[in-house]
């Protein structure tokens, strides 16, 4: 599954990014209540997509950081599935990244790489492309690219 979670920010200031819009006194008045509501709505979508079984692989875009991902997999009912996280802070000025969640017992990671976006061979201040190669529980090899343009 792939899901653009549309500005999944915590409500803490990150001095290295332009996240002021998502602070309690920012333009969106991003309170802890709004953060928790967003967190719960995202977990509900992931569960609904999986039906009776959780999705083995979940690509996400527009996540602020590893903290929100850890909250998603540890502080919601998704915790019982023990999702693992692949994420790296990107050079994006707003601080939004791509990530992959996966079930370790269903998907074995062979390779991961974050591919920078370049213009004229110069890395741009934007989200990297996340490349993940792995083997499913049915022995199929997948090459996954998670990106957001």
What residue spans do the PLM features occupy?
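Active-site-proximal beta-strand elements of phosphoester/diester hydrolases
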Residues: 1-7, 27, 111-113, 141-149
